[in-house]
Amino acid sequence: FALAHMVNDFDIMKSYLDEGANGIETDITFSPEGEPESAFHGVPCDCKRWCDRTVSFDSYLQKTSDLSTPGHPDYRENLLIIILDLKLNGLSQDALANGGRRLADKLAAHFWTVGRRDQRATFVVSVPQTSQKVFMKTFREGMEAIGMGDMNAKVGFDFTDNGDVSVTKAVYDELGITEHIWASDGITNCVALLFRGTSRLEELIQKRDEGESTYISKVYAWTYDKETSVVLALELGVDGVMTNYADFVISILNKPEHSSKYRLATYEDDPFERFKAV
């Protein structure tokens, strides 16, 4: 997956989809009460990016629903996965709980109501810290409560705190989440990968490959903008690369030395199916 980073308005969304990105990551802000409000990152953000792009969350959902619905004039077949990078830090536990329910309500309203279930996008609900696990809990409960439990097939989960892998697994076990788990490791593009290292990324890939007992479906790295970093990630066996330059990542993927082992995912590929590194 070539995952376009910080896709927070429609102009940049079009640009990345034109480049061939098959996934987008969007920052979602919340009110103090836990109501999803807008796609917005703000400063600071990645180097060489405009931090203040924004649209309302409802407008964002309507647009991405149109883009992922076959037969709609705006349909884009390469939009496969939408990572919702949820800006939850600072919210109380009550607000987190409300936020999970409200996100379920909004996704259902825009994507899975009667007559709209043919849309093709899959979501990753990306929570910053394991201490905010109640958000995932109430999201899943909310989906069941509104009769959308079957649509959990289109939803995955991710914690982005670069935390201890065993602790993260214990939290998923507590939540009863045993599949559809995307695991990520990364750092802003303003810091060289040399300083971050890849030891945790390699640990995630190893856990993914351990067998049927593992809890990880996919592993992605962020935010990789340099060829050396992208090549290293591919050689390690990641499932996705999040980047500010989707066309650049795709061009690397298409080089002969990589295209014999990897290709860009399509709709026929299950975003939650586990593939081992070779």
From Swiss-Prot:
One Gene Ontology cellular component term attached to this UniProt record is: extracellular region
Q: Name one GO molecular function term.
A: metal ion binding
Query: What InterPro entries does the annotation carry?
Result: PLC-like_Pdiesterase_TIM-brl (IPR017946)
Spell out the family assignment given in the record's similarity comment. Belongs to the arthropod phospholipase D family. Class II subfamily.
Function per UniProt? Dermonecrotic toxins cleave the phosphodiester linkage between the phosphate and headgroup of certain phospholipids (sphingolipid and lysolipid substrates), forming an alcohol (often choline) and a cyclic phosphate. This toxin acts on sphingomyelin (SM). It may also act on ceramide phosphoethanolamine (CPE), lysophosphatidylcholine (LPC) and lysophosphatidylethanolamine (LPE), but not on lysophosphatidylserine (LPS), and lysophosphatidylglycerol (LPG). It acts by transphosphatidylation, releasing exclusively cyclic phosphate products as second products.
Cofactor(s) the record lists: Mg(2+)
User: Where does this protein hold Mg(2+)?
Assistant: E25, D27, D85
Enzyme Commission numbers on file: 4.6.1.-
Which keywords, in A-to-Z order, does the entry hold? Cytolysis, Dermonecrotic toxin, Disulfide bond, Hemolysis, Lipid degradation, Lipid metabolism, Lyase, Magnesium, Metal-binding, Secreted, Toxin
Q: Which GO terms describe its biological process?
A: killing of cells of another organism; lipid catabolic process
Going by the record, the broad EC class of this enzyme is lyase
Q: Cofactor: bound how, per the entry note? A: Binds 1 Mg(2+) ion per subunit.
Catalytic activities: an N-(acyl)-sphingosylphosphocholine = an N-(acyl)-sphingosyl-1,3-cyclic phosphate + choline; an N-(acyl)-sphingosylphosphoethanolamine = an N-(acyl)-sphingosyl-1,3-cyclic phosphate + ethanolamine; a 1-acyl-sn-glycero-3-phosphocholine = a 1-acyl-sn-glycero-2,3-cyclic phosphate + choline; a 1-acyl-sn-glycero-3-phosphoethanolamine = a 1-acyl-sn-glycero-2,3-cyclic phosphate + ethanolamine
Superkingdom to which the source organism belongs: Eukaryota
* Major location (coarse): secreted
Provide the protein name: Dermonecrotic toxin LspiSicTox-betaIE2iii
Give each disulfide bond as a residue pair: C45-C51, C47-C190
Q: Which residues form the active site?
A: H5, H41
Q: Where in the cell is it found?
A: Secreted
Tissue specificity here reads: Expressed by the venom gland.
